[in-house]
Amino acid sequence: MVDMFQFAAIVLTALSMSVHFGTWLTEAPIRETSSGAVFTEIQKGRDRVASRVMPILGNAAILLVAACVFLSRTVPIAFGLSLAGLVLIAADMAVTLTCNVPINKQVQGWNASAPPPVWAELRDRWEKFHTIRTVLIVSGFSLFTSSVVFFRVH
């Protein structure tokens, strides 16, 4: 049973992480050089999908990792790594909800052909917090996965 929880937690956390990492890797160069109109269209398009999928995916991943932390409590090193991973994954969610989502909601209300004069400042702020949350979830995923791969929990 532990193996099933660990497998599901790894898959869901990897999917969530891949959205953050893929966005950071592929869209950051476009955002840096694009016009306000292009930035707005990209953000609005991605967020139409992400705002529906990511809350479910992210919360399910956190719950499964939390279950794995509980199940690993008898193996101290696995417990510690899993718990550290969970804390970082939860911190990713906190940054997302308190920093990125409010900006996303603002952008959703913009007219792509006439973004507000402060669009570049909001883009840079969004990018800074996106980088932070990407580092958090990649680190959290790595710690959690190492607990599963290197330390057997029965």
Residue ranges and their predicted role:
Residues 4, 13-60, 105-124:
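Interfacial loop at the N-terminal end of multi-pass membrane proteins
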Residues 146-154:
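Juxtamembrane boundary at the C-terminal end of a transmembrane helix
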Residues 57-68, 134-142:
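Core segments of transmembrane alpha-helices
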Residues 2-14, 70-71, 75-91:
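Interfacial segments of alpha-helical transmembrane regions
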Residues 10, 48, 55, 83, ...:
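Internal alpha-helical transmembrane segments of multi-pass membrane proteins, especially GPCRs
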Residues 90-98:
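Mid-bilayer segments of alpha-helical transmembrane spans in multi-pass integral membrane proteins
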